[in-house]
């Protein structure tokens, strides 16, 4: 790839000094096979620790009351980012932050438990493709 048309700044963000494209994918080689396992942008870096939003979402989805969840990072001065979870519960189900934290403590390392939890009354917004 030579770069983005008339956009040197965007080109510099995705090409390294040797011209390799930084796709944002995380993977590993196992013999001749390349396994793509995650995306860099799906990671929250909290005080130098990489946290997979997908891993935290999967743990939250294990709770019977959860209909939808979205985990993301929010800026934090000291640690860089902190985790936040937006959760929509199933109809007629109840869950509070303390109960969720206890539930997650059995499934995740302490630093992976969201610092902030927002319970949404309505389903979480989606883009046109879902």
Model-derived segments and spans:
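AMP-binding/adenylate-forming catalytic core of the ANL superfamily
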Residues: 2-3, 8-13, 18, 24-112
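AMP-binding/adenylate-forming catalytic domain of the ANL superfamily
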Residues: 109-129
